[in-house]
């Protein structure tokens, strides 16, 4: 029976730190389902959803993880018309029904530090569990966006974002 873990995030943009978590979960014999947020639960504004989904797909291809990881756009179909956010608990419940087993939630220590703010965090722990992996790359999407807005060329950031993601950012003029 396959073991699944769900890795949700803004992925704005996806970077090598994100991919390191995916690689390590795969090494632990999990199939990783990356779920970009459609509407952030804490109101954070992001690049358009379709761009973030495509960047995640490119990152998985670049890191040769497509056999063990995939991008899932379930948040778009679950998003209420009211503009309310989609909560992780609801995503996990829907994926459990689709997969036939309960996936655990892949998180880094940054999420663990704010875990009690999350909607139905106790139920997530009880029904799904968390796979908490330490960060090996101290990279923040916020810092990447700031560097790009300051005029740094996306291709100069290949140490922190996969090259196809950098090329995509440049081609679409994101984060200017």
Where are these regions (language model features)?
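Nucleotidyltransferase catalytic core that binds NTPs
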Residues: 1-176
């Amino acid at each position: 029976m396959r073991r699944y873990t769900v890795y949700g995030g803004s992925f704005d943009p996806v970077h090598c730190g994100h991919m390191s978590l995916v690689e390590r979960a795969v090494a632990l014999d999990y199939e990783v389902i990356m779920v970009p947020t459609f509407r952030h639960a804490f109101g954070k504004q992001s690049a358009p959803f379709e761009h973030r989904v495509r960047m995640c797909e490119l990152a998985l291809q670049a890191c040769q993880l497509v056999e063990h990881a995939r991008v899932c756009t379930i948040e778009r179909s679950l998003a209420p018309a009211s503009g309310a956010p989609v909560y992780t608990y609801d995503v996990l419940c829907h994926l459990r029904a689709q997969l036939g087993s309960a996936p655990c939630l892949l998180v880094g220590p940054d999420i663990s530090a704010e875990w009690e703010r999350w909607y139905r965090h106790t139920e997530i722990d009880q029904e799904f569990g968390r796979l908490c992996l330490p960060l090996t790359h101290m990279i923040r999407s916020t810092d990447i966006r700031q560097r790009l807005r300051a005029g740094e060329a996306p291709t100069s950031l290949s140490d922190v974002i996969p090259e196809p993601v950098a090329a995509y950012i440049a081609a679409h003029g994101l984060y200017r």
